[in-house]
Amino acid sequence: MSPKTAHVQVLAPLTGVMVPIESVPDPVFAQKMVGDGFSIDPFDGTVFAPVSGEIVDLQNAHHALTIRTPEGIEILIHVGLETVSLEGRGFTPHVARGDKVAVGDKLITFDVDRVAREAKSLLTQVVVANMDAIASIRPETGMVVGGRSLAATIEPAAPKARASAGGGGEAFVGTVVIPNPTGLHARPAATLVALAKGFESDIKLASQGNTAN
């Protein structure tokens, strides 16, 4: 019998009220296209690290970032809805890509009044971006305090052997033009991820010197 993997506790990144992810007025999150998790209706504008790990992504608009835990779980925090269109206005990052953070560290501050006026919603989503890394996530309910209250418990997926991707396969390369002014973000990104999961392959994107799989 293999040993049990320890559960991962996710603290609330913001002070506010827990909201079921299915209730978020955006199908990308409500339908869990990005991943499963929870939402918070915030009372203030300070985002704390809900887990310890490495900042593996910080969006240019500073409204969203991803932390990878030591277990390999990627936690995406997305402040507000359609906040990418603010192009960083009202947001101040306190970390950079590659930084190591501990639970409770300050990640982002934002102007609550401005974001409330200029964005669709203040609802802040916290989701697991790589769902294959977990077996389940159990969100809490009610009011939570940023950096202090338990917001969810994650059961990591059992370790499994990965098949070797080396040799024997064909390589296909193509060019895609994205007319969306905000780029490959949110809904189009989630759609692409859903399509990619239908293939047993190593898929990489490259643009302007940046790459991602």
Label the model's feature ranges.
Residues M1-G167:
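Contiguous, well-folded functional domains in the mature portion of proteins
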Residues S52-I55, T175, T211:
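A general secondary-structure boundary signal
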Residues I73-I77, G174, A212:
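Short beta-strand segments
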